[in-house]
Amino acid sequence: MSEPTGSGQPGGGVWAAREYDERPWGSYTVLDDEAHDHKVKRIVVKPGKRLSYQQHARRSEHWFIVSGRGAVTIDAVAVPVAAGHAVDIPVGAAHRIENTGNADLVFVEVQHGDYFGEDDIVRLEDDFGRAGPG
């Protein structure tokens, strides 16, 4: 896990980011990737953008919406989400999130499983021409 900075008191420090990447839909920052059974990311989706409709064979995901509003689709069922909402995505479920607001949609993603590589992503639909295996 990353080493914290600051005083160690609540609100007194932050975790140092491990990896940052920009994508066509926004960006993500890896917050924790050293455990063998989970990985934690902060994900930002720009207004009007959405992630690919995808599946994972070796991990589940839990999303906690920090700010903004959007729609989450799991196995073809879409539900609205906003700050404070949480979503559980089982292993193998087809899923995506879309920003339906006019501000960034920010959420924390906790992946749980035994493998977190890009090749455990099967993109069923993608707005940016990336459909197919990761």
Q: What would you call each of these model-derived segments?
A:
Residues 1-39, 46, 52, 121-134:
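A short, N-terminal "cap"/entry segment at the start of jelly-roll beta-barrel domains
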Residues 31-33, 41-43, 51-56, 64, ...:
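Short histidine-centered beta-strand/loop micro-motifs
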Residues 49, 58-59, 77, 93, ...:
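A generic "binding-loop/recognition-motif" signal
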Residues 51, 77-79, 120:
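Short beta-strand segments
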Residues 52-54, 72-73, 89, 95-101, ...:
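Short beta-strand His + acidic residue motifs that chelate non-heme Fe in jelly-roll/DSBH
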Residues 58-71, 75-76:
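Glycine- and acidic-residue-biased ligand/ion/polar-headgroup-sensing regions
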Residues 62, 102-123:
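A short hydrophobic beta-strand segment most commonly corresponding to one strand
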Residues 76-94:
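Short acidic-glycine-tyrosine-enriched beta hairpin
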